[in-house]
A protein has these predicted regions:
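Hydrophobic alpha-helical transmembrane segments
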Residues: 1-5
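Helical transmembrane-bundle signal
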Residues: 6-10
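Conserved beta-hairpin
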Residues: 12-50, 105-137, 144-146, 151
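Acidic, Ser/Thr- and proline-rich intrinsically disordered linker/docking segments
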Residues: 50-114, 140-186
């Protein structure tokens, strides 16, 4: 029940805190280096397949949101950063999103140009528009994207429509760039 769940969560938190007590991240123009327990892992921006950034409200009101940033590389490896073991994860994730935007956007644009569908969690995009599961909404009807209260929302025909939990939508920064470009072209 609830007690067992809390015990498992507490155990996992202790494990992660111990594992990441010496965690260091260095950001460079072409990627970053993650050092854990003396082992370096180099992650190039062009090797990243997805970035997911979630801000969760802490149970401790004064502390503010807790950030979790997850990178997945094209070889399937995942790397996570959280405020529990690293300072300023929100700023780190912003730098990661800035570094990965161009390579990810180029890959998505090539796939769209080839007529493919590209998924972003619970939604997908095509060259014609956004597919929310009930047909394609043309790009000209999609005005903006935002994250609020842990939800991703699109402005469609002037009204905000929730499309999914932020934790389920990878590469929001790429989706945001696609929406902005569609608005500029429309």
């Amino acid at each position: 029940g609830f007690g067992l769940g809390m015990l498992v969560l507490a155990g996992w938190s202790l494990y992660v805190a111990r594992r990441d007590r010496d965690l260091r991240v260095r950001v460079y123009d072409n990627g970053l280096v993650v050092t854990r327990a003396g082992d370096d892992r180099v992650i190039r921006w062009d090797a990243v397949a997805s970035v997911n950034h979630v801000a969760m409200q802490s149970l401790r009101v004064r502390r503010g949101p807790t950030h979790l940033c997850t990178l997945k590389t094209r070889d399937g490896a995942a790397t996570q950063f959280s405020d529990a073991t690293l300072q300023n994860v929100a700023g780190l994730c912003e730098r990661i999103q800035a570094g990965t935007l161009d390579p990810l956007l180029r890959r998505v644009a090539a796939r769209l140009q080839a007529g493919e569908r590209v998924t972003f969690g619970p939604l997908a995009v095509t060259s014609q528009g956004v597919d929310l599961g009930r047909g394609i909404v043309p790009w000209v009807r999609v005005g903006a994207i935002r994250e609020a209260d842990g939800q991703i929302a699109l402005r469609i025909d002037g009204a905000w429509r929730k499309v999914g939990a932020a934790g389920r939508v990878d590469n929001v920064h790429v989706l945001s760039a696609l929406v902005a470009k569609a608005g500029a072209d429309g």
